[in-house]
Amino acid sequence: MQTFAEISAVRGHLKTFKREGRKIAFVPTMGNLHEGHLTLVRKAREYADIVVVSIFVNPMQFDRADDLNNYPRTLEEDLSKLTAEGVDVVFTPTPEIIYPEGLDKQTFVDVPGLSTILEGASRPGHFRGVTTIVNKLFNIVQPDVACFGEKDFQQLAVIRKMVDDLAMDIEIIGVPTVREMDGLAMSSRNGLLTLDERQRAPVLARTMRWISSAIRGGRDDYASIIEDANDQLRAAGLHPDEIFIRDARTLQVITPETTQAVILMSAFLGQARLIDNQTVDMVVESKDEAESNDGTAANAE
C-alpha cells in the first residue's frame, strides 16, 4: 500500500495504472474507519483492479466548528486497517493542500434542489461542501467506480445527481448500511458516545423500524407518526433532530404514485449526531405481516 498527501504525487501514480488499462475504484472517507468503511473497501475490490481510499476531514461540509473540531482523527489506526484490507493507494491530503486559498476563495459545486431540502434546509452549505470535495477528489483520482454508504441517503442521491448532471464517466455504487449487533448503524461519530449513551443509541433504529411497521400497516398520518416517534426518542434520552418520511426516488412528499418511501432520521445524543434511514415499500401489509417484519435490518455509511 502506498500513501500520498500531495495531489501531483497521487495523480502521477494513478496515471500509471490508467495507462496499463487497469480499473480504479475509489472510496472517499473522513477517516476514523470502522467496519462500515471496510465494507465499502471490499465492495470496491469487487469492481476494480486498484482500490484507492482517501482520508480527509472536509471543513467545507461542517456547519458547526465544534463538530469539525470534535470529529475523531485516527490516521495511524486507519492506515493499519487499510493495509490489512489490501488497499492499493491511500490519499491523505491536508486542508491546505485541498483548499490552498482557503474556503472563501474556493470554487464550489452546487446541486440545486436536492441540496437545499430536508437535511440541506437545516444545514445550509453542507451538501455544497460534500459535492465540492467529492468532485475535486474525482478529478484527482479519476476513478471508474466510486462506493458510498447508503446510510447517508440524501448525500448519495445528491452525488448521483451531480455525476449525472456533469456527465461524469463514473459508476456510483451504493452499499447497504452495516450495523452493530443491537441495530445501531455504524458511524465514526459513535465513538463520541459514553457507555450510557451507547446503550441508549439503538433506540434510533428501533424507532425507525416502528415507523416502518406503521407505514406498512397502512397508516398515512405521517405528522402523527413523526410526533409519536419523537416522543419515543425523548423518552430514551435522545434529542430529536429531524424525521422525514418521503418518496425514496424524489425525496419529495409522498403521493399516491409513490411506490417506495424512505424514513430519514437524525437525533442528538451527547456530543454525537446520529443518523439513519430505511426504505419502505408502499404496500399495505396485514397487522401480523407488519409486526413480523418489524425487526428487519434497515437500508441505508
Curated annotation (Swiss-Prot):
Catalytic activity: (R)-pantoate + beta-alanine + ATP = (R)-pantothenate + AMP + diphosphate + H(+)
Subcellular location: Cytoplasm
Primary localisation category: cytoplasm
Pfam hit, one: Pantoate_ligase
Residues reported in the UniProt entry to bind (R)-pantoate: Q61, Q155
Pathway named in the protein's UniProt entry: Cofactor biosynthesis; (R)-pantothenate biosynthesis; (R)-pantothenate from (R)-pantoate and beta-alanine: step 1/1
Keyword presence, Cytoplasm: yes
InterPro entries reported for this sequence: Cyt_trans-like (IPR004821), Pantoate_ligase (IPR003721), Pantoate_ligase_C (IPR042176), Rossmann-like_a/b/a_fold (IPR014729)
GO molecular function ontology, one term from the record: ATP binding
Gene Ontology CC entries for this record: cytosol
Family: Belongs to the pantothenate synthetase family.
Additional remarks: The reaction proceeds by a bi uni uni bi ping pong mechanism.
PANTHER family, alphabetized: CYTIDYLATE KINASE/PANTOATE-BETA-ALANINE LIGASE, PANTOATE--BETA-ALANINE LIGASE
Name the UniProt record assigns to this protein: Pantothenate synthetase
Gene: panC
